[in-house]
Amino acid sequence: MLKQVEIFTDGSCLGNPGPGGYGAILRYKQTEKTFSAGFRLTTNNRMEMMAAIVALEALTTPCEVTLSTDSQYVRQGITTWIHNWKKRGWKTADKKPVKNVDLWQRLDLAIQRHTVKWEWVKGHAGHPENERCDVLARDAASNPTQDDVGYKPES
């Protein structure tokens, strides 16, 4: 039987684009681990994705994961849009390159060994873990230490 793990995530951006951060909580039974990091120039969507990626990549064995995010972009992207993007060679319906393809590919890889149930939670609505992740993400965004090397400003 697979370990049952809960992951809660949030991303933040002070300006969009601008300094950003992510926060994630990984919970297995009574044990919790938190993750956060800040980036000098990024977007809110990239930080939402990074939160999920980092937490999923921290899992060392296949797990049954319930991942809660307040990002419809992440949830819809990974459960619905990604299938056609892959069929089209990472292009959108109007033949444009998929934005944040580096992170979509990384997220796609990160979920392969797990059974993931994606849950959407309303942000800033008193969901305790989402609020904690929001604080982690905002604190990280306020003190960015890394460059988001995959971020490509739109020209």
UniProtKB/Swiss-Prot annotation:
Residues 1-142 form the RNase H type-1 domain. One of its GO terms (cellular component) is cytoplasm. Its cofactor is Mg(2+). Its main location: cytoplasm. It catalyses: Endonucleolytic cleavage to 5'-phosphomonoester. InterPro entries: RNase_H, RNaseH-like_sf, RNaseH_domain, RNaseH_sf, RNaseHI. Mg(2+) 1 binds at D10, E48, D70. Keywords: Cytoplasm, Endonuclease, Hydrolase, Magnesium, Metal-binding, Nuclease. GO terms for molecular function: magnesium ion binding; nucleic acid binding; RNA-DNA hybrid ribonuclease activity. Its EC number is 3.1.26.4. One of its GO terms (biological process) is DNA replication, removal of RNA primer. Pfam families: RNase_H. It is found in: Cytoplasm. Binds 1 Mg(2+) ion per subunit. May bind a second metal ion at a regulatory site, or after substrate binding. It comes from the Bacteria. Mg(2+) 2 binds at D10, D134. Endonuclease that specifically degrades the RNA of RNA-DNA hybrids. Belongs to the RNase H family. Monomer. This is Ribonuclease H. It comes from Serratia proteamaculans (strain 568).
